[in-house]
Design a protein with these regions (language model features):
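Anionic group-transfer/hydrolysis microenvironments
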Residues: 2, 78, 148
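Long, low-complexity segments enriched in small/aliphatic residues
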Residues: 116-120, 126-150
Length: 285
């Protein structure tokens, strides 16, 4: 039996997928492979956004996802038809998308690694967009996506062994087996931030560098043309259409969750959960 890093071709059931099930029958209606032959831990952690968007003069019922793979996918949610896929950070596991085959990702064959070959992959094992929620404002017509741009060096152990160590059996279990790349620097792509993307074109409208990555809690947007983002130890507020900075409120506690809004006795509030960096059990709101 082949190990994960020896598989170059496989069917959809073992890949990372977006799929649609008929709720009345439980049967599969359509699926789309976001990362065929995933050997880089680029699973689809991020949630989906459904919207009605005018694309090339047609009103499309779309589903959008920006998972760990670093690619922003837009599909027709009624039938799974591929509309577009654009990297939102530097990526090298994929070289393009086959529009003649419903946008199937074209895997970079040089991205596969083994016992003798280590490969530097963009994005890293933590992903370009993990659990932190993105949001969509239909009035501004933009998606607000917290992202992290980085890399990770993958290699394989000689034999499958849960005690292999040295990063050979998964991210976060011993570090990389080779010297890591520096995260920060003028010649390195290790950056986090917030992007406002236009789903009509799948391109960036505006961006906030340095307000994303692993310390970002996600975004929320309102009908009043505002975007709220928790990142690091700050709550940021922007104009939804232009990205103009309106507020940066420090709260001096790390690990924020995404902001939410609610109303009590006619007054609207913004809330978010945080924690210290030292004891997870010491939660603060």
């Amino acid at each position: 039996q082949k190990t994960a890093y020896e598989i170059k071709e496989c069917d959809w059931s073992s890949d990372v997928c977006s799929s649609d099930l008929d709720a009345s029958t439980g049967k599969l209606k359509w699926y789309y492979q976001t990362v065929p032959t995933d050997s880089w831990d680029l699973d689809s952690v991020g949630g989906f956004i459904m919207a009605d968007v005018t694309i090339e003069g047609r009103n499309r019922k779309v589903i959008m996802q920006a998972p760990k793979s670093g690619v922003f996918y837009i599909l027709d949610r009624t039938n799974g038809q591929f509309i577009s896929a654009e990297p939102f950070v530097p990526v090298n596991w994929v070289t393009g998308f086959d529009k003649k085959n419903n946008g199937k990702p074209i895997i970079n064959q040089d991205a596969f690694y083994d016992q003798q070959k280590s490969v530097l992959i963009y994005p890293g094992g933590g992903g370009a967009h993990n659990w932190a929620p993105m949001s969509y404002n239909p009035n501004a017509g933009l998606v607000y996506l917290p992202y992290s741009a980085g890399s990770y060096t993958f290699s394989a152990a000689a034999e499958p062994d849960p005690k292999a160590g040295g990063g050979a059996h998964g991210l976060g279990r011993g570090g990389e087996r080779t010297t890591p790349m520096p995260i920060w620097g003028p010649d390195n792509v290790g950056r986090g931030g917030l992007q406002a993307r236009d789903p009509k074109t799948n391109q960036i409208k505006w961006v906030k560098q340095g307000r994303g990555g692993a310390a970002a809690g996600g975004t929320m947007t309102t009908a009043s043309n505002l975007v709220f983002q928790t990142a690091g130890t700050n709550l940021y507020v922007y104009r939804a259409d232009t990205g103009e900075d309106l507020l940066a409120l420090p709260f001096n506690i790390g690990g924020p969750a995404p902001p939410v809004t609610y109303t009590v006795d006619g007054t609207q509030y913004i809330g978010f959960a945080t924690r210290t960096h030292f004891k997870i059990g010491r939660a603060h709101v």
